[in-house]
Amino acid sequence: YLDGAEFVIWWERSVLKDSTPYGVRMPTSTEQILSPARYERGDAPLTVRFTTAGSDVLHEDTMGEMELRIVDGHLAGRDSRNESAVPYGWGGDRYRTIRTPDGPALVWYVVWDAGRDRDRWLGQGGQRLRALGRPGYRHTVEAVDLAGRAATRVIIAPDAWIGWNSPPGVGVVR
């Protein structure tokens, strides 16, 4: 809520102050609320979609930059979101949890605005995520390329998961 209030304060001081942030001007991502300058320059989120339906999907969704910051804050040992003054460079993401005989599997792709954004996250939050341990599970956090864009793929799944050989893929719609 506080970030939304800060966005409205920014709005009232910006060149957009004579309009309202509703309808077609409504922000379309938490990134735009967290970084109003990105909103102002039209940095819209990318739509990331899994390319296969999958019969054992438990849940599928987008995290967004706010949730990514919350995860990073938790991994860093803080109870609140990551208070980084540097914008993450989040472009879009999609995660899926999958039912397996040995427990749930998570596959999560994040597309970044630039390779430096991806590399910065891999060296911080990604490194902490990779270090997590869970008996009977394997963790991978790696750089991938999606349609010419810098991305990361996170997989946390049981050691025996058959998807390790061919994990679900995604495509970038925009």
Q: Could you say what each language-model-derived stretch is?
A:
Residues 1-12, 71, 76, 152-154:
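Generic low-polarity alpha-helical segments
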Residues 1-66, 103, 117-118:
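Amphipathic alpha-helical substructures
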Residues 6, 25, 44, 56, ...:
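Compositionally biased, intrinsically disordered low-complexity regions
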Residues 15, 75, 79, 126-129, ...:
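Generic secondary-structure transition motif, activating predominantly at the C-termini of alpha-helices
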Residues 45-106, 121-122:
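Short, compositionally biased low-complexity segments enriched in polar/charged residues
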Residues 91-174:
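C-terminal soluble interaction/assembly domains
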